[in-house]
Amino acid sequence: MRAEIEALAQDIRRSAALLKRHLNWDEALMRLDELNASAENPDLWNDAGAAQKIMRERNELDSAIQGCRALERELADLAELIELGEMEGDQTVIDDAEEQVRALKERAAKMELETLLSGEADHNDCYMEINAGAGGTESQDWAEMLLRMYTRWAEKHGYKVEWLEESAGEQAGIKSATIRILGHNAYGWLKTESGVHRLVRISPYDSAARRHTSFSSAWVYPVIDDTIDIQINESECRIDTYRASGAGGQHINKTDSAVRITHIPTGIAVACQMERSQHQNRARAWDMLRARLYEAELQKREAAAQALEDQKTDIGWGHQIRSYVLQPYQMVKDLRTNVETSDTQGVLDGDLDMFMAASLAARVQGQVDQG
């Protein structure tokens, strides 16, 4: 086996060992046996909430255990295949197997990174709000570019995207939008994207072709299920109904059924306009508000994070997390981790994993450093 491939094999073995340590392997195997026994209990579904919790834990633990075993099994199979190819002098077999080792290394690295997603709500679906900053059409166009960037990222990772609210810009773009991203670890990955995003480019809306700086924000909070009890006093909320203001098309329900709920004590406001009836929009908006209040509580409990609403000051120079420069040169730079790339088009097409991974690792390291 060539030195390069042997080094990759060692990396895969290290990743598998780390994953096993993270799981507390022996304890994880015993816990899975317990969960499997519980799942076979005919009385399990007498308590639907408890049953869902058990089944969710079982599925996640089984997936993690099988993932570790698959790494070790596939690496052993590929090593045998390479050895066989070398014995028979079949370079095609060797080349194919080595390519599979490289792909396995990438998979192992991703699995290792996902061990960092251990927060209380990291495995949940999430809501994402995009809001344009000051600057009119420029910022509104940038907000729509951000929305496209995140939907492309979600599609590349096999996540489903639901549109909940969209407010069209005056000439182009959007003033705001809210989407729901459904998939395992959606919140864990996207929580690193909350903050202000800055764009520098030659404006397509400026006849003098001058360079403009625009700001838009992304705010992410987890979808919560019925096992998490968030009490809301309805007397502390204001409910408004209005006509949907989006541009129409597949995402917007153009009726008078849109609903906005404002939680007066915190100032948190949510809106939904995508369902067909006001009743449905109202129910979805209450779910969104519960999720926002839960996220605010999570932020208070996390030593490494500030309270969510304290972050939401004016969308401008403060609280920037990333800068996107398209002219006079091309560079996207994360201001928290200093990770950067000149592939601006790739980033705007949803290639965000390098930024998310670095930010997630830095956040976890910060929690370790703080105690």
Curated annotation (Swiss-Prot):
Q: How is it modified after translation?
A: Methylated by PrmC. Methylation increases the termination efficiency of RF2.
Q: Which domain of life is it from?
A: Bacteria
One GO molecular-function annotation for this sequence?
translation release factor activity, codon specific
InterPro entries linked to this entry:
PCRF, Pep_chain_release_fac_I, Pep_chain_release_fac_I_sf, PrfB
**Family label:** Belongs to the prokaryotic/mitochondrial release factor family.
In terms of one coarse class, where is the protein primarily found?
cytoplasm
Q: What keywords would UniProt list here?
A: Cytoplasm, Methylation, Protein biosynthesis
Tell me the protein's name: Peptide chain release factor 2
Query: Which SMART domains does this UniProt record tie to the protein?
Result: PCRF
According to its UniProt entry, the function of this protein is described as: Peptide chain release factor 2 directs the termination of translation in response to the peptide chain termination codons UGA and UAA.
N5-methylglutamine PTM sites in chain numbering: 250
NCBIfam families xref list = prfB
| PROSITE patterns in UniProt | RF_PROK_I (PS00745)
Q: Which organism is it from?
A: Paramagnetospirillum magneticum (strain ATCC 700264 / AMB-1) (Magnetospirillum magneticum)
Tell me the compartments it is located in: Cytoplasm
* Gene this chain is encoded by: prfB
Gene Ontology CC entries for this record: cytoplasm
